Curated annotation (Swiss-Prot):
Gene: PRRT2
Domain of life (superkingdom): Eukaryota
Family membership: Belongs to the CD225/Dispanin family.
Organism of this sequence: Homo sapiens
UniProt feature, compositional bias: Basic and acidic residues: 9-18
Renumbered residue ranges of the record's region Disordered: 1-261
Function text: As a component of the outer core of AMPAR complex, may be involved in synaptic transmission in the central nervous system. In hippocampal neurons, in presynaptic terminals, plays an important role in the final steps of neurotransmitter release, possibly by regulating Ca(2+)-sensing. In the cerebellum, may inhibit SNARE complex formation and down-regulate short-term facilitation.
Name of the protein in question: Proline-rich transmembrane protein 2
Amino acid sequence: MAASSSEISEMKGVEESPKVPGEGPGHSEAETGPPQVLAGVPDQPEAPQPGPNTTAAPVDSGPKAGLAPETTETPAGASETAQATDLSLSPGGESKANCSPEDPCQETVSKPEVSKEATADQGSRLESAAPPEPAPEPAPQPDPRPDSQPTPKPALQPELPTQEDPTPEILSESVGEKQENGAVVPLQAGDGEEGPAPEPHSPPSKKSPPANGAPPRVLQQLVEEDRMRRAHSGHPGSPRGSLSRHPSSQLAGPGVEGGEGTQKPRDYIILAILSCFCPMWPVNIVAFAYAVMSRNSLQQGDVDGAQRLGRVAKLLSIVALVGGVLIIIASCVINLGVYK
């Protein structure tokens, strides 16, 4: 009976021995370890893990076969049962030892796969997030607008001085023309550029000497006299200009600038004086008066008036001379014929 009870206990231990390595802590760690790692990545395909049952099955068969004869040969005892249980558990330990190095390998293999899949997932996420990035590309479009807008502003700003620059030149040219009209030599190009621009309606500069050698004050007096004479004359709005504004080429000789070598208008004052000796006293006196007026207008610079007055004086003096000669001849004929 003792042998039968020991055999039954050994058989129970042998039957429980495969359950222990399958249900031991090593098996729980092996089963729980990899699923925890794989739970983080749902997309990873679960690789077939060599469970402890598969590895332990051939290992356990050896000890079972070896234990059976040992248990049958040995008598029933506590020491033998303990040894049997230890031997039965030892394959589980071996299985644990065999499984424990494999678990880290499985974990290490799974970790690179997880990292690769994580990087792939991150790349896919970045690619999915990357398409919105081209949205800021329209930003370069506003660039031509600021470029197009400032181009007119700098163009306008430099043009302002360019537009203002011709004004001194125009003023200098107008002053030069006035000086030429007033018988004044125009300013030289160097003087006009270096000196300040003269203000309009300003007296001629002192640097420009007049052509006739008269000072600027004399020219101003001549201009004022011309204005006064026009105010008192019967033709205030006459288009005929004076010497101060329109220099006549007739006054200019071969030695004067702008002169064509023409003669000055004659006043015929000598012919008028000769006509005064003729018996045409009202006519010759008027001719002499016109000759004097022609000379005065020529001195004042009114060339057109001098020519007009000179022509009248010439006509009257000729009439006086011819009429006087005819009167003298008629008187002589009458007197000589009567006394015969």
